[in-house]
Design a protein with these regions (language model features):
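Short, flexible, basic/aromatic active-site loop/helix in glycosyltransferases
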Residues: 1-8
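Residues that recognize and position ribonucleotide moieties
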Residues: 8, 15, 56
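Conserved nucleotide-sugar donor-binding
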Residues: 11-26
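Active-site phosphate/pyrophosphate-handling residues
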Residues: 20, 43, 62
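Active-site donor/metal-binding and catalytic loop motifs
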Residues: 31-32, 36, 51-75
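Acidic donor-binding loop at a coil-to-helix junction in glycosyltransferase catalytic cores
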Residues: 34-46
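Short, hydrophobic alpha-helical packing/hinge segments within bilobed ligand-binding/sensory domains
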Residues: 44-45, 77, 88
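Non-catalytic, C-terminal membrane-associated alpha-helical segments of glycosyltransferases
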Residues: 79-86, 96-157
């Protein structure tokens, strides 16, 4: 099949795998991420990748998902981006260990801040306004993630 690419993680809505792999490594979805409504699959498949299993993605396979109207607005996008920043910190620490994960988290903070700042001169273009807000939200989520992860339980909406 064309367009097959090796990746380190995938979403759980379009995956086939052998159950023996799950049993062998006693893998499960991290319940600490339930309150976010996202991220459980990313962490699960990153662990699978770290065990040496190959994960492939193909853009020729079509997967559809219902559109939720309450998610089709800028406010929801900003909150989701913040959540992704916060849980990104948790995933980095879970995969790489406490110190390395902490360092990676703050390097990603710098990355998201610099991406947002690089678009600041294009602020009058609506497309870039959304991108700037998205990057700043992700930056802020990463920045405060180590301090607020356990306290967040209201962002799942």
């Amino acid at each position: 099949m064309k367009n097959i690419k090796r990746v380190s993680w995938v979403a759980s809505n379009n995956v086939f795998l052998e159950y023996d792999i799950i049993k062998k490594h006693k893998l499960s979805f991290d319940k600490a991420l339930n309150k976010f409504g996202i991220g459980e699959d990313q962490l699960f498949f990153l662990k699978l990748n770290n065990y040496g299993y190959k994960i492939y993605w193909c853009d020729a396979v079509k997967v559809t998902e219902d559109t939720h109207k309450h998610r089709a607005n800028l406010n929801w996008l900003i909150k989701r981006s913040f959540r992704l920043g916060v849980l990104g910190h948790y995933i980095d620490m879970n995969i790489h260990g406490r110190l390395t994960g902490f360092i990676i988290n703050y390097l990603k903070c710098i990355y998201y801040f610099s991406k947002a700042f690089s678009y600041i001169f294009l602020f009058f273009n609506i497309k870039f306004q959304v991108q700037i807000l998205n990057y700043f939200s992700r930056f802020y989520g990463r920045l405060v993630g180590p301090f607020v992860f356990k306290k967040i339980d209201f962002f799942r909406k």
